[in-house]
Swiss-Prot record:
Protein's GO biological process: regulation of transcription by RNA polymerase II
Biased composition range(s): Polar residues: 279-288
Source organism per UniProt: Xenopus laevis (African clawed frog)
Basic and acidic residues bias locations: 127-149, 309-319
Cell compartments where the protein resides: Nucleus
Bias kind Low complexity: ranges: 205-215
Spans annotated as Disordered: 127-155, 197-236, 269-334
Entry GO CC: nucleus
Protein known as: Zinc finger and BTB domain-containing protein 18.2
Family: Belongs to the krueppel C2H2-type zinc-finger protein family. ZBTB18 subfamily.
Alphabetized PROSITE patterns for the sequence: BTB (PS50097), ZINC_FINGER_C2H2_1 (PS00028), ZINC_FINGER_C2H2_2 (PS50157)
GO molecular function: DNA binding; DNA-binding transcription factor activity, RNA polymerase II-specific; zinc ion binding
Domain named BTB: residues: 24-91
Gene: zbtb18.2
């Protein structure tokens, strides 16, 4: 059995209790105004109060609202709506109610206020149009007829004075018809327009000029100086020396393009960065890889003294020699005494090193292949390639990072909880959990979160309607 009037009676009882101050458990302060209310009603009607009371229910007896956004009359109106289900604007500005409803996340009220503002704009626009139509209506009076008659006589006299001038101008056009003048005699009309430019320019802009003169001026085609379109090629400023040095991965062998060498090297750097973020499949290499042909051409271009190794190979060779000279096993048995403040521990194998430089040299050994040899870019254009999926990378470091996705290796372990991660930046994000820091704050409800992803999920869940309303 249902009682349809139960909800209405419940609201009436709650409204009476609020006016009597009975069982009111919170006070809302808007500037100097105080409003006694029930937390359950506020949290049920406003998402702002719901989030406000959810964390610390016993310590939120007084709620301070921003008086710069929420005015006391607007909050009183919204409070009346919460307890009675009625919204009566009376003489209160709709903008104040909209601001207060947006601040309190009352989305139904926000939609109503926006609808009223749109209707107000439409009504004001229609009123302006109606007033303009009334002003444009002719006045049936004798004075108006006399004035229009005098104006027409003045226009006719002005037109008669202009006709002899036109006759002289047209007589010099070799008797061409009026239909062909606009096509074949543009230079002649251009000279005529230049001579009368000082007179017709003022007549076009002035509203009191005769209609016949204005129409005659607008019928003239534009002169060569004003209306001609310049289709000549003009190079862009600051890009005169820009010449593409390759097309689809093949180097241009033109001897005149001497300034294209730095551009090719710049394209190689961009290519390396693109390989890190988006790997290439073996199928695309079989069809024809433009990057491979470009690297092949560069291998022959930058050779010197008969050596075809790149600078990257030299760096790898220097690192290998340094690692051979200073092995970690020799460090542990050398008996060198180092102060505790200078000890550097490898985060991957927990070995101890006397300086950060030696630690960096040791870290590079973790990214070698199992046979203790580095995959280097050879002169024929081969690059480090994943043996499982066939993706290619610019260096060995990115290849090793990629191989963790197949092997599931997690070399970075948290020292407090023992949780492991594949990448170091994931371990850094996880460390915030143990420090109890909450650097990410919501600008609508002032809640704070440890991770940025938690903040984004919170906004999508609780403030999605408000964000859309603000964007609109």
């Amino acid at each position: 059995m249902e009682f349809p009037d139960h909800s209405r009676q419940l609201l009436q009882c709650l409204s009476q209790q609020r006016h009597q101050g009975f069982l009111c458990d919170c006070t809302v302060l808007v500037g100097e105004a105080q409003f006694r209310a029930h937390r359950a009603v506020l949290a049920s009607c406003s998402m702002y109060f719901h989030l406000f009371y959810r964390d610390q229910l016993d310590k939120r007896d007084i709620v301070h609202l921003n008086s710069d956004i929420v005015t006391a009359p607007a909050f009183s109106l919204l409070l009346q709506f919460m307890y009675e289900g009625k919204l009566e604007f009376s003489n209160l500005p709709v903008e104040d109610v909209l601001a207060a409803a947006s601040y309190l996340h009352m989305y139904d009220i926000v939609k109503v206020c926006k609808g009223k503002l749109k209707d107000k704009e439409l009504n004001s626009g229609e009123k302006i149009i109606d007033d303009g139509e009334k002003d444009d209506k002719p006045v049936d009076s004798e004075e108006h007829h006399e004035h229009s008659f005098d104006a027409s006589q003045q226009k006719i006299s002005t037109l008669d004075s202009v006709k002899p001038i036109w006759k002289e101008k047209v007589s010099g056009l070799s008797g061409l018809s009026s239909d062909l003048i606009g096509v074949n005699s543009v230079p002649a009309e251009a000279v005529m327009c230049k001579r009368a430019a000082g007179k017709t320019k003022a007549n076009d802009s002035s509203p009191s000029s005769p209609l016949s003169q204005r129409s005659a001026n607008h019928t003239h085609p534009p002169s060569d100086r004003d209306g001609a379109l310049d289709l000549s090629f003009k190079p862009m400023p600051g890009r005169d020396s820009f010449h593409p040095s390759y097309v689809f991965g093949q180097l241009v062998s033109d001897s005149q393009q001497q300034g294209s060498l730095p551009l090719v090297k710049h394209e190689q750097d961009l290519l390396s960065e693109q390989e890190d973020s988006q790997a290439k499949s073996p199928k695309s290499q079989q069809v024809g890889n433009p990057a491979k042909s470009l690297v092949t051409g560069l291998g022959h271009m930058f050779t010197g003294n008969g050596n075809s190794h790149t600078r990257e190979d030299d760096l790898y060779q220097d690192r290998d020699e340094s690692e051979d000279e200073m092995d970690s096993s020799d460090l542990s048995t050398s008996g060198v005494l180092v102060s505790p403040g200078q000890i550097c521990i490898c985060p991957l194998c927990s070995k101890v090193f006397p300086s950060p430089h030696i630690l960096q040299l040791h870290l590079s050994s973790h990214f070698k292949d199992k046979d203790n040899s580095r995959i280097k870019m050879s002169p024929d254009g081969s690059v480090p390639t994943c043996t499982i999926c066939g993706k290619t990378f610019s260096c060995m470091y990115t290849l090793k990072r990629h191989e963790r996705t197949h092997s599931g290796e997690k070399p970075f372990t948290c020292g407090q909880c023992g949780k492991s991660f594949q990448y170091s930046h994931n371990l850094s994000r996880h460390a915030v959990v143990h420090t109890r820091e909450k650097p990410h704050a919501c600008k609508w409800c002032e809640r704070r979160f440890t991770q940025s992803g938690d903040l984004y999920r919170h906004i999508r869940k609780f403030h999605c309607g408000l964000v859309k309303s603000l964007v609109v």
